[in-house]
């Protein structure tokens, strides 16, 4: 009886734990138990054989292992095993970005506004060349004019403007500055405008001259490496300006100079930074901390004493064509309750970057829809010849060719001059040119005396050249932002423009990948130029290469290849930048013995 009862107990225990014939049956049986024994009737008809004690224990171990593998419960922790979970990036949308004022990036009759739509101060006259307001101007100017007519009692809100190249951003701060200066002469410095390159300084000064009335009430001074430092200092001392347009390095040089009198920033009303993305990540250590310190009132909330003395922090206006991609970096500018004016994706080539999105504006660049892009793929040894054929085939009047290195510009200029004899003039513009030589060369190009201008990226930012028909990337740009800035030299103010990029099969692969990631590939046309296409020009091309080889060999013997281009104007000397290391000499107290 005892053995019979043990057998019955064993049968009862094994009704729910029948070992199947194959390995997959373990999982089937576990599923059956989990589902509430729905198939009890069919299983009950089967007769289970008695199991030995060792078999039961082995079956239990298998069940534990399978259960742990399925993630239902973990019996033992496996040493060295780490469970990783993919977490979604936290997306934060700043309120000032979410409430941005948008405008169309396309300039045409449907988006432009009549001049009567904006009421200008009486002392400002509209130049005859301007017939309408562009979208960015119509969006920004009314609010800035209102603050000038009715100044807020406390610190005004700062402004960030993200608009495509050639959309008319410069007027968005030129007119408010002239309105703040007023119609009566004064010796108060109202605005400081900072730009990254010398050529842009001269361009902005010319824009002020266009809008300033005949009496010239507003005194505008340019400070850059194109002028002699001591001459600039004497000009500042004899006739204090209302507006300063400068490069950051030259402004710091004047602010820290021992030549009296110093520039007074205590009553500054506008601090404007054009092409802000070009200023670099060390701009705060190099010059921004110094300017904010001398302005005063930027590190604390305005108090009653500041209101009585009419001393307040200046209003910052930050502009760039790629500003919307660098929304995170705007924190470096220490903007006060900023207002964002941004181009919309409607009627514009919207370029969404592949970087993680912080908000709905970050990661976007805008390129005018009037620009067409073509990618020419050929062997590197035929690149100069491909550029020559593209220029002559399309009959461009003004062509800007971008290169990455100075040596490339010299070689390409020599070859194109040989190929283009008796057809058109070719010249090259690099950062090694100083003083008047820069402006003379740009003036010749604007007057169409030079049909082709080879340049480095010193002209890729902000510089407005007259009616550039085509931009050629002889060396492909390293990133999408540089591509947008280069392309922005053509197709300005709603005009048609063409961009031609030249590369080989290897560089094409990386370049196309970059454009597709940022949705810049779009309507790009790809053209393959095989060797037989160049046969008609091969004799002239061979002679040009022989001439280049002889010139390089001659320069190597005489050392001429190492000589820097002859400079005119003042002799520029590179100085160390102590502030780049985070030093702030203006904060150091003078020690008394």
UniProtKB/Swiss-Prot annotation:
Residues 10-19, 37-66 have a biased composition (Acidic residues). GO terms for molecular function: ATP binding; ATP hydrolysis activity; RNA binding; RNA helicase activity. Residues 150-341 form the Helicase ATP-binding domain. Residues 552-561 have a biased composition (Polar residues). PROSITE patterns: DEAD_ATP_HELICASE, HELICASE_ATP_BIND_1, HELICASE_CTER. A motif (DEAD box) lies at residues 377-380. CDD domains: DEADc_DDX51, SF2_C_DEAD. Residues 580-593 have a biased composition (Basic and acidic residues). ATP binds at residues 163-170. Probable ATP-binding RNA helicase. This is Putative ATP-dependent RNA helicase ZK686.2. It comes from Caenorhabditis elegans.
């Amino acid at each position: 009886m005892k053995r019979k009862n043990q057998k019955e107990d064993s049968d009862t225990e094994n009704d729910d734990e029948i070992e199947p014939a194959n390995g997959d049956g373990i999982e089937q049986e576990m599923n059956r138990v989990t589902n509430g024994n729905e198939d009890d009737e069919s299983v009950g008809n089967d007769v289970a054989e008695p199991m030995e004690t060792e078999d039961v224990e082995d079956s239990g171990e298998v069940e534990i292992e399978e259960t742990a593998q399925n993630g239902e419960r973990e019996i033992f922790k496996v040493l060295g095993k780490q469970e990783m979970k993919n977490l979604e990036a936290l997306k934060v949308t700043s309120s000032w970005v979410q409430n941005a004022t948008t405008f169309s990036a396309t300039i045409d009759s449907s988006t432009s506004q009549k001049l009567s739509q904006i009421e200008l101060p009486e002392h400002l006259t509209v130049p005859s060349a301007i017939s309408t307001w562009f979208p960015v101007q119509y969006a920004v100017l009314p609010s800035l004019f209102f603050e000038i007519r009715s100044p807020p009692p406390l610190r005004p809100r700062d402004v960030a403007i993200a608009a495509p190249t050639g959309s008319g951003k410069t007027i968005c701060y030129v007119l408010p500055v002239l309105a703040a200066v007023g119609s009566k002469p004064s010796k108060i410095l109202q605005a400081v405008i900072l730009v990254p390159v010398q050529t842009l300084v001269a361009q902005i000064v010319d824009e002020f001259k266009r809008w300033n009335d005949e009496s010239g009430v507003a005194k505008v001074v340019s400070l850059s490496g194109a002028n002699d430092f001591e001459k600039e200092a004497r000009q500042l001392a004899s006739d204090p300006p209302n507006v300063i347009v400068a490069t950051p390095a030259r402004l710091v040089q004047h602010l820290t100079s021992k030549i009296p009198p110093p520039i007074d920033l205590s009553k500054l009303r506008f601090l404007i930074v054009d092409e802000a993305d070009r200023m670099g990540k060390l701009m705060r250590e190099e010059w921004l901390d110094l300017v904010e310190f001398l302005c005063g009132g930027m590190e604390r909330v305005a108090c009653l004493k500041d209101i009585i003395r009419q001393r307040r922090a200046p209003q910052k206006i930050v502009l760039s064509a790629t500003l919307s991609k660098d929304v995170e970096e705007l924190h470096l500018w220490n903007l006060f309750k900023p207002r964002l004016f941004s181009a919309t994706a409607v009627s514009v080539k919207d370029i969404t970057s592949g970087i993680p999105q912080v908000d709905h504006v970050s990661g976007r660049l805008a390129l005018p829809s009037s620009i067409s892009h073509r990618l020419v793929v050929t062997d590197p040894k035929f690149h100069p010849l491909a550029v020559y054929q593209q220029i002559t085939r399309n009959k461009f009047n003004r062509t800007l060719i971008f290169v990455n290195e100075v040596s490339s510009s010299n070689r390409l200029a020599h070859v194109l001059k040989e190929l283009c004899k008796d057809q058109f003039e070719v010249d090259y513009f690099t950062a090694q040119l100083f003083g008047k030589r820069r402006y003379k060369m740009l003036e010749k190009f604007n007057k169409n005396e030079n049909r082709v201008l080879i340049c480095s990226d010193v002209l890729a930012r902000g510089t407005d050249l007259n009616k550039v028909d085509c931009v050629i990337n002889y060396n492909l740009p390293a990133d999408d932002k540089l591509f947008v800035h280069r392309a922005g030299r053509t197709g300005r103010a709603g005009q048609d423009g063409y961009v031609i990029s030249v590369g080989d099969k290897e560089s094409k692969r990386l370049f196309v990948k970059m454009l597709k990631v940022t949705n810049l590939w779009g309507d790009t046309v790809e053209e393959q130029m095989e060797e037989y296409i160049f046969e008609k020009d091969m004799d002239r091309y061979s002679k040009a290469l022989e001439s280049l080889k002889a010139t390089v060999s001659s320069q190597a013997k005489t050392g001429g290849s190492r000589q820097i281009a002859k400079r005119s104007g003042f002799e520029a000397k590179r100085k160390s930048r102590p502030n780049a290391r985070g030093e702030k000499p203006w904060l150091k107290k003078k020690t008394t013995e």
